[in-house]
UniProtKB/Swiss-Prot annotation:
Key words, A-Z: Acetylation, Cytoplasm, Cytoskeleton, Disease variant, Guanine-nucleotide releasing factor, Membrane, Phosphoprotein, SH3 domain
Identification of the protein by name: Dedicator of cytokinesis protein 2
Region (Interaction with CRKL): 939-1476
UniProt GO MF annotations: GTPase activator activity; guanyl-nucleotide exchange factor activity; small GTPase binding; T cell receptor binding
Record domain SH3: where: 8-69
InterPro entries: ARM-type_fold, C2_DOCK-type_domain, C2_domain_sf, DHR2_DOCK2, DOCK, DOCK_C_lobe_A, DOCK_C_lobe_C, DOCK_N
Polar residues bias locations: 1651-1665
Pfam families in UniProt: DHR-2_Lobe_A, DHR-2_Lobe_B, DHR-2_Lobe_C, DOCK-C2, DOCK_N, SH3_2, TPR_DOCK
Domain comment quoted from the record: The DOCKER domain may mediate the GEF activity.
Disease: Immunodeficiency 40: A form of combined immunodeficiency characterized by lymphopenia, and defective T-cell, B-cell, and NK-cell responses. Patients suffer from severe invasive bacterial and viral infections in early childhood and may die without bone marrow transplantation.
Length: 1830
């Protein structure tokens, strides 16, 4: 195989197919992956992925597209740069970055944004292809670049990526080659642009914002139109007149573009095919702001009078007849809102003339109003909006606008009239006429023939232009309307004649009737005429507007004789004025007379740069004709309309300077001319004429020629200044100062021309005059007269504008000196704001770019800045002044940044010495939300950036004393730290932030050198300074903008390549500075532990290795000082918690910390053991903290609670009270979020254990986190108790609440003697007692959960927990929630503990099953009648032991009687703490397993059955309204052998000689079982007796059957096992049931077990059901309480039926056959009594001599009868709507005097006596451990 060789040209490639690597050396690729190629061999490359450089390997060449690159070598590294254009590279990078975000948006289901990004990416991909094609014309490429950059910037903004700053050409600015100030301004501009862009994107009206912004920013615009085709069935030649039209004003606003179309459907001139292009130019912003603009096309047919006429020979040809119009609304295209593309074709539908009185102009209005069907006829055009005038667009769009493109100008002047734009166009519009028919029978077909005639009547050739693109003609013939009395032509033509001919020409209009027949038409002559002169007698042109002309009649030959009509009036108003002396038709001369019945009107518009319509202006322009009126005309100029003046700007200025030049020896007109010049300059300064600035500039440079004007201008100006300085009145001075810029331009230009003409003659005199002129200005500035204040402000504002020009003819240094005097002569506190603004203008001038000028000007500027910045002024003024100050300083720094360093050294030094500290203090005192803060910070950054090493050294030496230097360094460090912590720039200004960081880093290191030199020695050591340094450095290293790992790959590389990893540099500096401290280190322990820890946690390996040893140095330092390092240890534990919770730290850090510290300790044996202990401590804490952080974002709050408790225990074990309490409250908050009020109370209770009932002040570490006010132990404990009691109340843990209430009551009664609080407390206790008795508390289920496998976090891995379920929570629901938390986990279907293979497997395995709580005995309830409401609470609370029973088969199985071989395997669990507690679950700390024999199982089952019977008897005795069905089911299931088989199976299994013989040790158990069977008979008898009383008639047969079965059963049992007797239950009083916790527990009313378990536990399982039942023992479930009405006397609490869980809890009353399958079927919630006690639930210790040891404490002391309980019964008929979950139920309270109380006592005494006889026999079998208290 060929060897691998280094890749030469093939260095950079992109994967174009997916490649799946098959082995280790092969690198898998996806389409689009960018690879760096290192070596090549045959068909393979070796390299790595650009995004993941660690992924290296080989890949086939055919899968890679090679990209051209250039290799740039920097130091020892090669930087490979793609060869494609930068913008294409940027698009590529952007697509990578957006692509990643695009996928994330999809995952996050953000559909709208996902589609938006997708659309933008498609656009960028398409534009990238166009960029790379290299085929775009220059203008299109420029526009495309703008679109691309705009789209990228917009996309980055909405995706919250970094802002990209660009230059004017759209290229990304390089911070290395851009000044800080320029970079800052570029960020500001980019932000503003994007903000505007986003506004436009949100507005659907302006989609093409880039074009819109370009259009709106230019004063002149053009519309390019290309006529592609004209589709229309005419059959004759046609003329197409296209123009722009304003429909609101109903006026045409441009010249017509004429296209002559042939009858065959082609242009008449075939070379014009595909070349019909026109540009409508001179459009200004006013035109763009019109509401509507239409492109209209008026079509005139040229041919016969009527198209329908046949016989072409007889018809008149060549008539211009109206045919139709085409109209298109182009408003959006004009304004740049709609797409403007020269390739997109637009169809303009054609609308024909339908009647003769449909004038083309009138038809436009109709077409606009109605959108009719054109039938496919119309005009096809493409159009594009172009920016600029005709000269500009010829340069910018050469492919569109070439020599063949026709130019159609605007009707009127453009907004800017350039000096070279000589124009003399007069637009004549034929408006309308009204012609009498006289002797004709029909109305005439009038044709107007217009021509331009000289004085002698001869027609001027080629003077009329019908439309742009057409040749000039001698005469114009109008459209002919057939037999219309009042034709309205509205046809516009242009008259263009030389200016010198204007005075002698006039327009002549001939009117002729045109006949449709050629023969008649030849005989027709002109029947009338009109004329009008274009110039008036006073030399002005005809006024724009409408003109009613006189119609002259007479001899047609005379009409061509000018002498015949020129003496007659041409306007109708002239005739009307003479009407008193002349008759209506008598005005005639030479055969022509005025027709009073005929009317003809025209309108004119003069667009001439040479002819004016103003008499005053004309007088000035022609001043030589009447020199005696010169003074008057000069004075009149000020009242001439400004528009007229600027229109003739060049001629007016020429006239003024000619007057000045021709009177050079006299000063007679100097002031008048000067004032006139000032007036004109002032006009141009007006906003209305601001665009004429360019005209004036052009005039001065190209047309101005008055070489002596400068002398006169300077003289008059100095006179004005001197007059004003003396406080005398000088009215024009303010206008003069405002016009100062152009006055000096004229002065300088005049002097330049003079100097060129006379080769520098009189230079000294000129400079002296200029110096005296500036001295006059300075004298004005010194003046103290009130009248001069405004003038001084004006001078400050306008003086800088003259510098550019003065500098050309005057010594720059001298000029600078004059300016220096100009500013220094103003009093220090006067006009400061204006001075600063003026100085800013000077700084931006060319003058300031010269070193010698800066030497003079900079000191005065810095002095002014310093004074102004240090002033204390009111806020509003301060903001303005500071704004001007920072602008000025920015301008100075900007200028200096682009100069050679050698020429700016002293200037930077000047700024540094004078202003650095002032700027720093301004930043420090300025609020971070101040509008100018970012400007000042940028300014400060720029100063520091431009300071060299020598500057730093020099600046340090400027401080006179050490304390001053320390103050400066402290200020700077504090400011830097504050700016790093609160960045003044927006978050997306990445470039600006990084440049600031780079500058700050250099400054910090420079100042650190100063600290080493001056403040390290013991005598000079400055602790606070060093402390500030370390805190600043750590703040710098840990700031978000430097954490590269958090950034995208593109951003990571961008920062690393441009700025490097600044964290390493500062980190190494911190290390070095620490080790230099020597003996001073101890001062920084423990203060610096936290910051150093924060630094070491940065995930950068080299940095960690360099800085972690500092920890050991700290430990060693403290150990040597005090013999231990407790301070360090305490601080590290405190800070570590905070840092890891904040997201810092990882497994690698933990390992690195351990290895480095142990390595360091190995070199110091005396401290090694302590270090090892410390490392173990920190490692344990880190593990727990990382676990905690790992679950903080987890949806599972359970995991968060577990980790919180782990940390609690850690801090408790290590006596960290403050941290312990902090996490207590975190745990409390988590519980409250989950409504775990009980657990929240227990959590808060832990805090109270740290407090005493004393009045001493609480230490800070035992206060609640964030608590402000100091409290005593008693106050805090009392407050906490009240909160906890509230939580216990919400969690229905009233027993606990009462306990705390009692403790509080004791304090109120015995310690603080606050009886008012005591009374409230006792009321609260009473309420809790009442709640215990009246409010239902559902019993929670408990679940064992095992987490097996290495996939779980350490706090769960291979551990078992017991969970306390929520109210009514089923195992299925709990398990589903559990699996949701661990979606990748596998559910285990077995309940046995898994083997090591599962525990060590990499996956996750979850085991979940229900367990039963085991109660501990409560001694205080022994031998006392306790209500079941009290007892039931303890059945599922305060429990720490649980068990799970599972049936197993042993020995031979008898298919007819499986009980004999049915053994129970019982697993017992002991948790770390009792439940409920601070968690809803606790880890199992001990597990054991026992086995229960079939006989013991039978005893348990019989005990359960007896308990159920007794419980139900109690229920029915207590409530006579209960339904009978449940009792029927229970009794029938036992007495009828057909249903369940009764206890016959026990007899077959155990009561045999064979069993007794084989199991002699079970004799006592057999006796016990027989005793239970015997006791069942009286219980059944009592139940049947109750049933007999309650049974309805329809169930009487059922009862009789059941009674018969019972008699048979009774006989059999009493015969076999003896007789048992009970007292008569009829005598028992209806009251609250009570329990005796002695030998047996009496009937219970509320059974919590029945509340929260499934109804699936039969009392006596069959062979089919036993396995399932014992594997998951459950009890019936009830959803909610049902209150008893207040008036009821029922003593029990009832349950309301659930509507939602009918399928699980509601079963109908079953027949006997169905009842055979179960001893108790589930019924409707209202009709079912549910057992809450299955004795198998409560057994936790294996039987030795008695089954009782397996029972709950309530039944463990019972010798012969098992513990019995009754479940809660539902009461039918109660209104569920009134139920409240917390509603207390009313119970009948029985007084001691009740006469039935004795009956109850007798019953209780009976049970005591009956059971006492057995207690001696069984008592010895009860383990002592079970009799202990809770």
């Amino acid at each position: 195989m060929a060897p691998w060789r280094k890749a030469d040209k093939e260095r950079h490639g992109v994967a174009i197919y997916n490649f799946q690597g098959s082995g280790a050396p092969q690198l898998s690729l996806q389409i689009g992956d960018v690879v760096r190629i290192q070596e090549t061999c045959g068909d393979w490359y070796r390299g790595y992925l650009i995004k993941h450089k660690m992924l290296q390997g080989i890949f086939p060449k055919s899968f890679i597209h090679i990209k051209e690159v250039t290799v740039e070598k920097r130091r020892n590294t090669e930087n490979i740069i793609p060869a494609e254009i930068p913008l294409a590279q940027e698009v590529t990078t952007t697509l990578w970055e957006w692509g990643s975000i695009w996928k994330q948006l999809y995952v996050a289901s953000k559909k709208e944004r996902f589609l938006q990004v997708q659309s933008m990416m498609y656009d960028l991909m398409e534009w990238r292809s166009q960029l790379l094609s290299g085929t775009l014309p220059k203008d299109e490429l420029k526009e495309l670049k703008q679109k691309v950059t705009s789209k990228i910037d917009y996309g980055n903004k909405i995706l919250e990526l970094d802002l990209i700053v660009r230059d004017e050409d759209g290229n990304i600015l390089d911070p290395d080659n851009t000044s800080v100030i320029s970079l800052f301004h570029a960020h500001e501009e980019a932000t503003d642009k994007i903000t505007e862009r986003i506004k436009e994107e949100m507005s659907k009206d302006q989609p093409d914002y880039a074009m819109y912004s370009r259009i709106s920013s230019s004063p002149t615009h053009s519309l390019y139109v290309f006529v592609r085709n004209f589709v229309c069935r005419i059959g004759e030649d046609a003329e197409l007149f296209m123009s722009l039209y304003d429909p609101n004003k109903q006026t045409v606003i441009s010249e017509n573009y004429l296209v002559r179309w042939g009858s065959r459907g082609f242009p008449k001139e075939i070379e014009m095919l595909n070349n019909l292009k026109v540009v409508f130019t001179d459009l200004g912003n006013k035109d763009l702001n019109r509401d509507k603009i239409y492109l209209i096309c008026q079509i005139v047919r040229v041919g016969k009078m009527d198209l329908k006429d046949t016989g072409a020979k007889k018809c008149t040809q060549g008539l211009r007849r109206p045919f139709g119009v085409a109209v298109m609304d182009i408003t959006d295209i004009i304004k740049g809102k709609a797409e403007s593309d020269e390739e997109k074709q637009h169809f303009i539908p054609f609308h024909p003339v339908t009647a003769e009185n449909d004038f083309l102009h009138s038809l436009l209005g109709k077409v606009i109003a109605s959108k009719g069907d054109s039938g496919g006829q119309g005009l096809w055009v493409t159009m594009k909006m172009l920016v600029g005038d005709i000269i500009q667009i010829r340069k910018d769009y050469p492919h569109l606008v070439d020599r063949t493109t026709v130019v159609a100008r605007k009707l009127g002047f453009p907004e800017i009239i350039m000096p070279g734009d000589v124009r003399n166009d007069i637009y004549i519009t034929l408006l309308q006429g009204d012609f009498d028919k006289y002797n004709k029978t029909t109305q005439r077909n009038v044709e107007v023939i217009m021509c331009v005639c000289a004085e002698d009547g001869k027609t001027l050739p080629n003077a009329i232009c019908v439309g742009a693109g057409d040749k000039p003609m001698n005469e114009y013939r109008s459209v002919v309307y057939y037999q219309v009395k009042q034709p309205r032509w509205m046809e516009t033509v242009k008259v263009a004649v030389p200016i010198e001919d204007m005075q002698r020409i006039h327009l002549r209009f001939m009117f002729r009737h045109r006949s449709s027949l050629e023969s008649k038409d030849k005989g027709e002559k002109n029947f009338a005429m009109s004329y009008v002169k274009l110039m008036k007698e006073d030399g002005t042109t005809l006024h724009d507007g409408f003109h009613d002309l006189v119609v002259l009649k007479g001899d047609s030959k005379k009409m061509e004789d000018a002498s015949a009509y020129l003496t007659l009036p041409s306007y109708r108003h002239h005739v009307e004025n003479k009407g008193a002396t002349l008759s209506r038709s008598s005005s005639s001369v030479g055969g022509l007379s005025v027709s009073s019945r005929d009317v003809f009107s025209i309108s004119t518009l003069v667009c001439s740069t040479k002819l004016t319509q103003n008499v005053g202006l004309l007088g000035l322009l022609k001043w030589r004709m009447k020199p005696q009126l010169l003074q008057e005309n000069l004075e009149k100029l000020k009242i001439v309309d400004g528009e007229e003046v600027v229109k003739f700007l060049q001629d007016t200025l020429d006239a003024l300077f000619n007057i000045m030049m021709e009177h050079s020896q006299s000063d007679e007109y100097d002031i008048l001319v000067f004032d006139a010049l000032i007036y004109i300059i002032g006009l141009i300064a007006d906003r209305k004429f601001q665009h004429f600035n360019t005209v004036l500039e052009a005039y001065i440079q190209q047309h101005f020629s008055a070489t002596l004007a400068y002398k006169k201008l300077m003289t008059v100006l100095k006179t004005y200044l001197d007059t004003s300085s003396r406080g005398e009145q000088c009215e024009p001075i303010l206008r003069t100062l405002k016009a100062l810029e152009y006055v000096f331009k004229f002065i300088v230009r005049s002097r330049t021309l003079f100097s060129q003409l006379y080769e520098g003659k009189e230079q000294m005199e000129f400079e002296e005059s200029m110096r005296r002129l500036f001295e006059s200005i300075n004298n004005l500035m010194k003046s103290q007269y009130k009248t001069t204040i405004l003038l001084q402000v004006a001078a400050l504002k306008y003086i800088p504008s003259v510098l550019h020009d003065v500098e050309m003819v005057f010594d720059a240094k001298l000029l600078s000196q004059l300016l220096y005097e100009f500013y220094t002569c103003i009093p220090p506190v006067k006009l400061q704001k204006q001075k600063v603004q003026s100085m800013n203008e000077i700084v931006q001038s060319n003058l300031f770019k010269k070193q010698e000028c800066r030497d003079i000007l900079l000191p005065v500027i810095t002095k002014e800045l310093k004074e102004l910045l240090e002033q204390k002024d009111d806020m509003q003024h301060q903001v303005l002044e500071r704004k001007y100050c920072v602008e000025l300083l920015n301008s100075i720094l900007e200028v200096l940044s682009y100069q050679d360093a050698a020429f700016t050294y002293h200037h930077i030094q000047e700024i540094m010495v004078q202003l650095l500290r002032t700027v720093n203090r301004t930043v420090i005192t300025m609020g971070r939300d101040h509008i100018l803060i970012s400007h000042f910070v940028a300014c400060m950054t720029a100063i520091l950036n431009q300071m060299g090493d020598q500057h730093y050294s020099f600046y340090i030496e400027t401080f006179q004393t050490s304390s001053e230097l320390v103050d400066f360094l402290m200020e700077t460090f504090i400011m830097f730290k504050d700016l790093i912590g609160k960045n003044v720039y927006p978050g997306d200004w990445m470039a600006m932030s990084m440049v600031q960081n780079r500058v700050f880093l250099r400054a910090i290191n420079k100042f650190a050198e100063t600290m080493n030199q001056k403040f390290l020695e013991h005598t000079n050591f400055e602790f606070q300074l060093w402390n500030n340094y370390f805190h600043l450095a750590v703040a710098f290293i840990t700031q978000d903008s430097l954490q590269l790992e958090q950034f995208s790959h593109a951003k990571y590389n961008k920062i690393l390549n441009k700025y490097g990893d600044m964290r390493r540099l500062i980190g190494f500096s911190i290390r070095d500075m620490w080790y230099k401290l020597g003996q001073n280190k101890i001062c920084f322990i423990p203060g610096m532990v936290g910051p150093i820890l924060e630094m070491t946690l940065i995930p950068e390996a080299e940095l960690r290795k360099a800085t972690i040893p500092i920890f050991f140095d700290m430990m060693l330092c403290e150990y040597q000082r005090s013999g231990d390092f407790k301070k360090f240890e305490n601080e590290i534990i405190l800070k570590l918690d905070h840092e890891v919770e904040g997201g810092r730290g990882d497994e690698q850090y933990m390992q690195l910390l351990e290895s480095i510290l142990m390595e360091c300790a190995a070199e110091h044996p005396t401290i090694a053991k302590s270090v090892e202990n410390f490392v173990n401590l920190v490692k344990g804490l880190l593990e727990k903290l990382l676990d905690y952080r790992g679950v903080m974002t987890d949806e599972s709050k359970d995991n968060r609670m577990s980790c919180t408790v782990n940390l609690l225990n850690f801090y408790k074990d290590n006596n960290r009270e403050e941290m312990y309490i902090r996490y207590l409250y975190k745990l409390r908050d988590l519980h409250l979020d989950c409504d775990n009020y009980t657990e929240a109370a227990y959590t808060l209770l832990l805090h109270t254990w740290l407090l005493k009932w004393s009045d001493e002040q609480c230490a800070s570490q035992v206060m609640q986190t964030g608590q402000q006010h100091p409290q005593t132990h008693r106050q805090l404990k009392e407050t906490l108790y009240e909160t906890i009691i509230g939580y216990f109340d919400k969690g229905k843990m009233w027993e606990e609440a009462i306990s705390l209430c009692k403790e509080l009551a004791e304090q109120y009664e015995m310690e603080i003697f606050d009886y008012e609080l005591l009374s409230q407390n006792l009321i609260q206790q009473a309420k809790f007692y009442e709640s215990i008795m009246k409010i239902l508390r559902p019993k929670p289920d408990y679940f064992a959960v095992g987490y097996y496998g290495q996939g779980f976090p350490s706090f769960l891995r291979n551990k078992v927990f017991i969970y306390r379920g929520k109210e009514y929570e089923r195992r299925e629901d709990f398990q589903m929630q559990l699996m949701t938390q661990f979606p990748n986990a596998e559910k285990m279907n077995t309940t046995s503990a898994p083997g090591d293979d599962v525990k060590n497997a990499p996956g996750q395995y979850i085991q979940c099953f229900t367990v039963q709580p085991v109660l501990d005995e409560h001694p205080r309830f022994k031998n006392k009648p306790v209500p079941d409401q009290i007892i039931n609470f303890y059945k599922s609370n305060y429990v720490q032991r649980f068990h799970y029973s599972r049936p197993v088969r042993r020995g031979t199985v008898d298919p007819e009687n499986e009980f004999a071989s049915m053994w129970i395997e019982r697993t017992s669990f002991v948790t770390a703490y009792k439940l409920p507690g601070i968690l809803r679950w606790f880890e199992v700390v001990h597990m054991s397993q026992t086995t229960i024999s079939p006989l013991e199982n039978a005893i348990e089952t019989m005990s359960t059955a007896n308990e159920k019977i007794l419980m139900m008897i109690n229920q029915y005795q207590s409530d006579e309204t209960l339904p009978i069905n449940p009792l029927s089911m229970l009794l029938n299931g036992i007495v009828d052998p057909a249903v369940m088989g009764g206890f016959a199976k026990y007899e077959k299994a155990f009561f045999t000689e064979e069993y007794v013989r084989d199991h002699p040790e079970d004799q006592d158990k057999l006796t016990h079982l027989k005793d239970l069977i015997a006791w069942q008979i009286p219980f059944l008898g009592a139940g049947i007796k109750i049933h007999e009383k309650r049974v309805s008639d329809n169930l009487r047969p059922f009862h009789d059957r059941m009674e018969e079965c019972f008699k048979n059963l009774k006989m059999k049992v009493e015969k076999e096992y003896g007789v048992r007797e009970m007292p008569d239950f009829d005598d028992r009083r209806v009251g609250r049931p009570r329990s005796m916790l002695r030998s047996y527990r009496q009937m219970s009313i509320i059974s919590l077990a029945s509340m929260n378990s499934d109804c699936s536990t039969p009392s006596k399982p069959t062979s089919e059901s036993f396995d399932l039942e014992l594997a998951s023992p459950k009890t019936p479930r009830v959803e909610q309480e049902e209150p008893i009405s207040p008036g009821s006397t029922l003593p029990e609490v009832k349950l309301r039926r659930s509507k939602k869980r009918t399928k699980r809890s509601s079963v109908v009353f079953a027949d006997e056959k169905a009842a055979a399958e179960s001893d108790l079927k589930r019924l409707s919630r209202k009709h079912e009594f549910m057992s809450d006690t299955n004795l198998s639930e409560h057994a936790a210790i294996p039987l030795k001599a008695s089954v009782l040891s397996q029972m709950s404490f309530a039944s463990q002391s019972m010798p012969t009868i098992p513990a019995l309980a009754l479940s809660v019964a539902g009461i039918p008929g109660l209104d569920e709507a009134n139920t409240s979950p917390r509603l207390s139920q009313t119970f009948l309270q029985l007084s001691d005097g009740d006469k039935k109380t004795l009956t109850r006592k007798k019953v209780n005494q009976f049970f005591k006596t009956m059971l006492a006889s057995k207690s001696a026999e069984e008592g010895k079998q009860i383990p002592d451990s079970l009799s202990t208290d809770l």
